[in-house]
Each structure stands twice: as structure tokens, then as C-alpha cells.
A protein has these predicted regions:
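Local beta-strand N-terminus motif with an aromatic residue
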Residues: 2-3, 76, 161-162
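A short, GP-enriched loop/loop-strand-helix hinge that lies immediately N-terminal to
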Residues: 2-40, 52-62
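Short, well-ordered alpha-helical microsegments
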Residues: 13-17, 67, 126-127
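ATP-grasp fold ATP-binding core
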Residues: 48, 71-93, 112-124, 129, ...
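Short acidic-hydrophobic, aromatic-tinged amphipathic segments that line or gate anion-handling sites
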Residues: 59-63, 92-95
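Short acidic active-site motifs
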Residues: 66, 99
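CheY-like receiver
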Residues: 69-70, 103-106
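ATP-dependent carboxylate/phosphate-activation module, predominantly the ATP-grasp catalytic core
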Residues: 120-123, 127, 131-175
């Protein structure tokens, strides 16, 4: 019979999954045209803002002058990462003009064609919201994941990951 569902739980495969759904007319998930809004960090921000969810201010990395202008607005440190990337790979926390200049040299040499996003650094506990949703869009099971340590620091410092699950969620986490 016809394939009517395609699913994976790996962020790395999102684009391939969407392409297969589009090619085989599978309507159970994201299609190719949906990919920019869920793969590019800069595009996601627009949808978060429409939903009333605050996001870190950002600047698409261009040149030293443009980046320094952004840093003047938000201050150091800033976080720089690929606009289209998985997890915390190739993520940099920059705390000075010297580190910014070193990053721009690294980008020019190693990844000249990769678009990077620069964001203000926000010190906060990371909370996620996970739910099983019924056919009408109502949550039938909810849970939260709290990560008191920055995932970026865990990856960059080869540290241990710490997180815990909560059942009773703060109301603002459901936004």
C-alpha cells in the first residue's frame, strides 16, 4: 500500500524527512517548504515572537563593523552559531573584541559560506515544554525538562549534563 506516515526523532534528519514526505505526498508532518522556519534560528524567532515568546536579540554575522555595532547594543558576551545547525555544534561564546576578531578570521578561513547568527547572551535556566496533543490541539499529557547548566557550556567544556523532569509546569512555560 501507500506510505501514509513518516516519522523520526532526530533533528539531523528533518530535511530528509520533509523531502520524502513532499516527494511521496505524505501529509503527516513537515514538508520541504516548512524547513526554513524550523531549521534556521533566525526564521524561528519570527514565529516565537508571533506566539508572544521572548527571544534573544540577534544579528546575522556580516563584518566586524556590523558585529561591533550589535555588541554595542547588547554588550559582551555574545553567542555565535550556525544559523542552520544541529545542537550546540560550532557554537562560540565571545567575550571581547579580540575573540570577535578571532571568530571572524576562523569563519573566513574554515566556513566562508556558512551563515552565522550572533545573539545576546542570556543567563537563565533552560526549561522545555513537552506534551502529547490530542486531535483537537489540546494537551493530554504535559511535562517539563529543566537544564540548570547551559548546553553550550556542557558541549564546549566537555562537562557533564544535568537535567531533571517536572510535572507541574510554571504557566509561562506553556506559552
Amino acid at each position: 500500500g501507500r506510505i501514509d506516515w513518516l516519522e523520526s526523532n532526530n533533528e539531523y534528519w528533518l530535511e530528509r524527512d520533509a523531502a520524502l514526505r513532499t516527494d511521496f505526498h505524505i501529509t503527516s508532518g513537515f514538508q520541504t517548504e516548512d524547513m526554513p522556519r524550523i531549521k534556521y534560528k533566525s526564521k524561528m524567532k519570527e514565529y516565537y515572537q508571533k506566539a508572544g515568546i521572548a527571544t534573544a536579540r540577534y544579528h546575522m554575522v556580516d563584518d566586524l563593523a556590523g558585529c561591533k555595532k550589535f555588541v554595542e547594543e547588547v554588550g559582551y558576551p555574545v553567542v555565535v552559531k550556525p544559523d542552520n545547525g544541529v545542537g550546540a555544534s560550532d557554537t562560540h561564546k565571545l567575550a571581547s573584541d579580540a575573540e570577535l576578531e578571532a571568530f571572524l578570521a576562523y569563519k573566513a578561513k574554515e566556513h566562508p559560506d556558512v551563515a552565522y547568527i550572533m545573539e545576546e547572551f542570556v543567563r537563565a535556566e533552560v526549561n522545555s515544554y513537552d506534551a502529547i496533543i490530542d486531535g483537537s490541539g489540546n494537551p493530554i499529557f504535559e511535562a517539563g525538562n529543566v537544564s540548570p547548566m547551559s548546553i553550550m557550556d556542557i558541549v564546549n567544556n566537555d562537562d557533564n549534563s544535568i537535567y531533571y523532569i517536572i510535572k507541574d509546569l510554571p504557566e509561562d512555560t506553556r506559552a
